């Protein structure tokens, strides 16, 4: 199976299993029968605003198919809940009398939308060039005579064959490769860019031709010309208009039910689109899903019970686009462009439980396509799943206590940590080891010898102090790389890796308890953390091992990665000039040790022919093999807390955001959500403060956030989730601001001038670390 075909649903099992070609042949005729093309709002006189004429065309489509069923559909209520559906391949059968084997003609149009009859046009033997098309367009706009342009559109979109004749670079060539669709992309763009500005009769003719194409009989596997036709039609901007959604849905359905090999071709053709065109396809599909779920005018669509296949089909085509995007480096669009914020308003836990219960083989769930679910929605799923696990475990503890006729104790409902500040790491390790069965309970921390009830502040302080101590260079567990501004695992060998497990548990507890940590790991760390996303039942299975590239190494050790890239591009004799072998050296506790990258590596010279293998093995050694035991302990610690299928919904980048927060700052949002104690938001000192902060460069804004919260990143829920507070500090204005990071609180003296406030604030945030100046 190809890499592209496998990656249809990153972070989750494949959503739809493609049928084998042998099975497909027997099912083909039934699979391609189209459902009746009807719209619940196709009644005459339905007001669609400026798009009224296209709405009339939808009315024509309804008239041609089944008037009786359309009337029944209009009387049916529309439900937002998706009915049970197994998958795209198990779509409901279609009535035989709907299949029209004869082309629909202009005479079939109702009288109010008939267009003047045109002679049967035919495309010239030589395909039209962009210049030819633009000249025809200019003449039509100047003279008002659109006959030539109309003839081109009506013929080009008359069938899949004509589409290929019109848009292939060479009509006689096969172009049966994934690297080249064989289409004149400039002509496709020009034709579609002009389409919405042409007269309505031309636009109707194009839609009529698409219907004819989709209604044709298909026997046997698709040809590459058919795939090209689908690829062209997918780019049609008419499908932005809701009145065309019935036709668009049928197009998506046919693309979604193609076999895996055909999807493979489409994916590689899609990745060749321009960023603008690709983004338009994604946005069009997301809008289609959103409006089907929450239509502004429900009467414009068939009842949801009559088109249960619309959303699954669109989701599968979105999966093809997502796969194409992941194959391009850098991606055509950010992965966040696939998020559909509309899904934040559906019953996410119902979607999650459906996916948990039925997987990918029965009922449809958006969790089968996690790339469309926003990180905020995924956080809700993970939090609620965590809460349910916490409640379940706490309830079981209570039942066990009662069954033994022991008095229940409220403390049994929590993971209670009692630690000494002077022995923070060892005490924390001992407590977490002894209370391994309680890790999924709500965390509460007590510092020995100190009074105080943990309402969240002590827990956050425990995290901050522990992380700060473990990641200190003198502790030796992690190495800080200044060039990449991140930590990486020390490769030093030891007998006990329990402290690496502790760090993993800390990260898991942070996610589980919705706490943002000030940790800087490179992106490849989170990729390894999801390899695999669920702990394998076989304990001998390697964990934390993933495929790595020189780009991953660049995120950790940019200087070394640059040197290896220089080696790859070196034009001289590598063996004679570098005199290297497949052996590398590392310093451990002042002792230089050697490691062979492959058996007998110390005797294998690096040459021009094998240097790529050397770079790959060296990269794998640094990021996988040399730290395997350390990372395996870290992996097991994290998953001992976050053992949930919800992790399968996440990308590595999203795990990082859940652990560390987002780097995107919005200080205006922070201003809107800030609470005040002793000040009012209209006080002069507060107005000075925000004038200064909003005028800060990004670097100083990050320092302010780190000074007051312990991290320069923002929680998934945004600035509002920080619960930021500014309190009045009734001290001399000569004092610097003070921060209580455990409570995200800034104590501000009543400075009398903006200049004084700015000076004191910059000094305070620039010369503090972790907890501010107290």
UniProtKB/Swiss-Prot annotation:
InterPro entries: E3A/B/C-like, HECT_dom, Hect_E3_ubiquitin_ligase. GO terms for molecular function: ubiquitin protein ligase activity. Pfam families: HECT. SUPFAM superfamilies: Hect, E3 ligase catalytic domain. Gene3D superfamilies: Hect, E3 ligase catalytic domain (3.30.2410.10), Hect, E3 ligase catalytic domains (3.90.1750.10). E3 ubiquitin-protein ligase which accepts ubiquitin from an E2 ubiquitin-conjugating enzyme in the form of a thioester and then directly transfers the ubiquitin to targeted substrates. This is Probable E3 ubiquitin-protein ligase HECTD2. It comes from Mus musculus (Mouse). The lineage of its organism: Eukaryota, Metazoa, Chordata, Craniata, Vertebrata. The gene is Hectd2.
